[in-house]
Swiss-Prot record:
It comes from Mus musculus. It holds the Pfam family DUF4679. Residues 69-80, 148-186, 357-368 have a biased composition (Polar residues). InterPro entries: DUF4679. Residues 83-93, 129-147 have a biased composition (Low complexity). This is Proline-rich protein 30. Residues 69-93, 129-191, 357-401 are annotated as: Disordered.
Length: 401
């Protein structure tokens, strides 16, 4: 509403709320009981009056003569003039005897207007953010109802400064009707846990089960959540490991867990993990430019993973994997074999050397028996003689006779 000035005060004082000025002359000098008969509709407060107050005064006239009005509307004998700054009432009631009443400086000819069409003209000096549109009135003799007064406002009202709407004026064309929460339904049927057609035990592989869960959750959503985690860490500057996004999963519907999903049997809830991963730009080439990809993992309790046949049985060991005990036993056996092989080779070499040095076995035996005596008789002999005698004696003892 425009600020209240003297002209608006004049209109509000002379015209009671709820009735247009065309019946003003009929109740100026009439008693109070006749007012109810003139206005059959309930009265409205002054804030519902559709005409804003212009800076100039309005002129009221009847269309009894076909003269052209001047710039200030020269009135005749059957018209009255309301001064702009006076609070007095009009003197005579003859000027409002006609049914055709217009406001403004320019009045159209009465012959060119049909009785059923009436226009509302506003003076040119009115310039503001709001403008009144020309509307057609169907019942000129009766007072305007609240619905009529509500329709007088234009649906296209532009204001440079946003302001809170008046509690009395309701404009449904300007307010955006947001959809209610009940009308928005999720793709899962309003959050109901619907069992999946595929049993998780049929996958028999954690990789295929993880891919199925990723397809149900949505790769775009996972990428967006991981990107938000990246930006949050960059903004806060928190060091640490790479961000990991965790999604609690229901293995009944193969979707993200909701309150309608059944309670899990185990304490740890199955979770789908998404984390950044460095991958080569060209598959199969480890050396070269890298790109950032998304890796996925599945966190399950051991009992549930075993029930879904995602873990190998305890007895069956994969090919190529050996226990530590077996490895130690094999090492011991190889060490013993190597020692035996080296012992036999050393014995063979020593026997060959003895055969070459002593052409006759009788002489060799005699010389070996005499060597200890020589060692005892000559204690100053070198250590090489004693070593040689010891080695030869041990060889003779071990060699077959």
């Amino acid at each position: 509403m425009l600020p209240v000035n003297k002209d608006q005060v004049l209109l509000q004082n002379t015209v009671p709320p709820g009735c247009p000025p065309q019946v003003l002359s009929q109740f100026v000098n009439s008693p109070a009981p006749n007012l109810a008969s003139l206005c059959p509709h309930p009265t409205l407060p002054s804030s519902h009056f559709p005409l804003p107050a212009p800076p100039q005064a309005y002129f009221f006239s009847s269309l009894t003569q076909t003269h052209s009005p001047g710039p200030h509307f020269s009135s005749d004998s059957n018209s009255d003039f309301v001064p702009p700054h006076s609070s007095s009432h009009p003197r005579s009631s003859s000027c409002f005897g006609q049914n055709y009443t217009y406001f403004g400086e320019k009045l159209p000819s009465p012959h060119s207007i049909s009785p059923s069409n009436y226009q509302l003209c506003v003076s040119p000096p009115l310039t503001g953010s709001s403008s009144l549109s020309q509307l057609q009135h169907s019942s000129p003799h009766s007072c305007q109802s609240p619905s009529r007064l509500q329709d007088l406002q234009s649906p296209k009202i532009t204001s440079p400064v946003p302001s809170s709407p008046s509690p009395r004026i309701q404009n449904n064309k300007q307010t955006w009707q947001w959809p209610q929460s009940g009308s928005i339904k999720s793709s899962r049927g309003a959050g109901v846990c619907v069992p999946s057609k595929v049993d998780p035990a049929e996958f028999k592989d954690s990789g295929t089960l993880t891919q199925a869960l990723v397809d149900h959750v949505g790769r775009r959503r996972i990428a967006r959540d991981l990107q938000i985690q990246f930006l949050q860490r960059l903004w806060l500057g928190t060091p640490g490991h790479a961000p990991v996004v965790e999604y609690p999963i229901c293995l009944v519907c193969l979707q993200i867990r909701t309150p309608s999903c059944p309670t899990p049997k185990y304490k740890t809830v199955p979770q789908l993990l998404a984390f950044p991963q460095l991958l080569p730009c060209v598959q199969g080439q480890e050396s070269g430019p890298l790109r950032i990809g998304i890796g996925f993992g599945l966190r399950l309790p051991r009992g549930q993973a075993r029930a879904l046949h995602l873990l190998p049985p305890k007895n069956s060991t994969p090919v190529g994997v050996e226990s530590q005990e077996e490895a130690l036993q094999r090492q011991k056996s190889t060490i013993q074999e190597s020692v035996q092989i080296t012992g036999t080779l050393f014995q063979a070499r020593s026997l060959r050397s003895i055969d070459l040095q002593s052409p006759k076995p009788s002489q060799c035996s005699r010389s070996l028996l005499q060597e200890p005596r020589q060692v005892a008789a000559s204690p100053k002999a070198g250590p090489s003689v004693s070593k040689r005698s010891v080695t030869l004696g041990s060889i003779l003892r071990k060699s077959p006779s």
